[in-house]
Amino acid sequence: MRQLLFPVAALFLNACTTTPVPPVDPQQAWVDFTTPTPGSKLVMAQRLDGKNLDDGRFFQFPPGHHELMVRFDFEVPAGGGLGGLSQMMYRTCFMTLEYDHFRAGQHYVLEGRSLAFTPNIRLYDSARQLLAEERSVNCL
């Protein structure tokens, strides 16, 4: 039984990593994610206008006002050891951002950053202009 478990698990993991991202719809706004902070693990779409999403790799939606909720996982010092910084643990935060002027065909980037225990997200347009920052942060 154990010998069968590993190949089946590998098959499911492979399916998750090879699912293609759908093509960009020019009639909608598109938001990708990035995290330049060392120790940042994940920025993922969680909700759009209060509704859970099926695919957390991106946001794609009609133009106008929208509220985006993202999940952001990043490393923080866990204490212990010399100076209390030898062990790390992951912190998970859910952050909400609102923006009124999403435009059709425009590509946006949502950037997750952390400074120690303090996370933030910023929304940029394709010219790297800052458009919005998070309005609420809830961490576990």
PLM regions: where:
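Sec-dependent bacterial lipoprotein signal peptides
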Residues: M1-C16
